[in-house]
């Protein structure tokens, strides 16, 4: 029987779930995750306790609960459940209040009340920009890009660009390096004026072949020898042009994005 983990929040629960994943990944154990978002009333808090207690009876063991409930009364109700309750706000906010000698707002959903703010608009603009400049489909306004990701097809450029836009409000374009570029031995002409904004992604050739085979099985495009050729040529070009790059093979999107932000010295725009 897998241990049951509840993610309880008065909002979407994204913060609590991200934190829970980070903590639980330290243990060689699978868990059954139950998400309980929008617990924004006492009635919902009591209903949540019922769910938690039912799980404890069913599992024959206490559940684990990660909470980000701002309302203290709702929080106390949930803490009375038959579970190990890990209260992120009490753990972090109260020490900060003492250190800063300030009282926090204790307002529910404060972090998400940004629909009309400049940060939100910046993020939406960045997403639209990244979608419009995905896979080299548009060369217009490349000068507005914060970063332009380059690399062979299927090396992780698109998901990384969108993650940078959605999470950080970064205008991230991406542009493919193709065999014709390697034959010419130089960057595509559209990229040359923006050399200082380029960041490269590479990938293990064998892994690239596996990914491409899912898209075009048995094709030259996915053949191991072709993947080796493209990767070798792309990395040689990036070294020759002085472009910073990394291998995406064993890195998560989050790790790739964080590395890119550090390398290009971009401050995070949205939070």
UniProtKB/Swiss-Prot annotation:
Catalytic activity: [pyruvate, water dikinase] + ADP = [pyruvate, water dikinase]-phosphate + AMP + H(+); [pyruvate, water dikinase]-phosphate + phosphate + H(+) = [pyruvate, water dikinase] + diphosphate
Single annotated GO MF: protein serine/threonine kinase activity
Signal sequence interval, chain numbering: none
Coiled coil segments of this chain: none
Keyword Nucleus on entry: no
EC number: 2.7.11.33, 2.7.4.28
Superkingdom of this protein's organism: Bacteria
Cited Pfam families: Kinase-PPPase
Annotated binding of ADP, by residue: 151-158
Sorted UniProt keywords: Kinase, Nucleotide-binding, Serine/threonine-protein kinase, Transferase
HAMAP family: PSRP (MF_01062)
Primary role: Bifunctional serine/threonine kinase and phosphorylase involved in the regulation of the phosphoenolpyruvate synthase (PEPS) by catalyzing its phosphorylation/dephosphorylation.
PANTHER family: PYRUVATE, PHOSPHATE DIKINASE REGULATORY PROTEIN 1, CHLOROPLASTIC
Family note: Belongs to the pyruvate, phosphate/water dikinase regulatory protein family. PSRP subfamily.
Name recorded for this polypeptide: Putative phosphoenolpyruvate synthase regulatory protein
Organism: Burkholderia multivorans (strain ATCC 17616 / 249)
Lineage, highest ranks first: Bacteria, Pseudomonadati, Pseudomonadota, Betaproteobacteria, Burkholderiales
